[in-house]
Amino acid sequence: MPPESNSQAIIVLGMHRSGTSAFTGLLNLLGVDLGPKLMAASPDNQTGYWEHTEIVALHDRLLAALGSRWDDVSRLPEEWWLRPEVAPYREQIKAILSRDFGSSPLWALKDPRMCRLMPLWKMLIPEMGLSPVWVLVARHPYENIGSLDKRDQFSWQKSELLWLRHNLEAEYFSRDARRVVVTFDQFLADWAGAMERLRAAIGLPWPVPPEIAAEQAARYVDPGMRHHKAADISRLSAWSREVHAALLAGAEGHETDMQTGMDAVRHAADIADSLYEPMLRDRGGELEQQLAAESARFGEISDCLQEMRVKYAEAKEKLAARKAELDENKARLKAFERTPGAKLNRLLGAGA
């Protein structure tokens, strides 16, 4: 059944490696329902990802259907969420939410891919009678890029573009909705204060009161979660510095200042996208054709190699058969040489 009308959802947004996992893990300690099956922890994220496995897999399939993937820095197609082929994904998401959160008074979802896919979510959530609170978790771009470099070995430029793309889109598409902006610094320094801001936006008490969860939360929110610290920010582009400043303003409650700062960068980025994306896509198409040609050539070589293996196996089998035949003949000859007739022939030959 659909989530009850008084069901409250929290949607956690943020770039990959921005602290969204730590934030969502704390929601779990406060009793927020995260669903029945979550992505397992890994050496890169030992405290857990806290992501709904089915939702993440569905997001990946949707991005692939749109010709994209989670680490694609390009814009998605115009009004992609209105395409007929996207409708089945919307219905699948609604079915998952109804099944897993139908009776949950307070639940949350977190997947960085939602930053890119928010238009679809903003369409389907009202269809289910829900009014979520969106939480944008922001981390200093220098730290975020360093974390991506360690995990994925992305170039600085790609990581910075991903950081910009995710934050610009998450901020833009969460406008005109209940939202809270929290920086990773705020979360580490005062998790209780960050959660109180979110609780006030929700208008509901936490299922597990913070004073009860405090001891466990204090152990969970460890400053050691920060493996990368902002250092030489001169490496950052002006756009990243401006977006970071805007997010800091939003985290302090200055909504207008945040939107103004984000709009300035978004406008410039849109102009750059319109200039460079066609060229990059053409180049990408050329590379795909080259890859297809090389793949075909590799296939031909593989087929040839397989044919040679078959011929080699056949030759080896024939050689083994000939050797066996030769061994058999040698054995027969030795056996014959031991017979009386063979000995007599040798004696007669010697007498002659």
Where are these regions (language model features)?
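PAPS-dependent sulfotransferase catalytic core
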Residues: 1-89
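Glycine-rich phosphate-binding loop used to anchor ATP phosphates in small-molecule kinases
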Residues: 81, 85-123
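A structural motif corresponding to the C-terminal end of an alpha-helix
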Residues: 96-105, 169-180
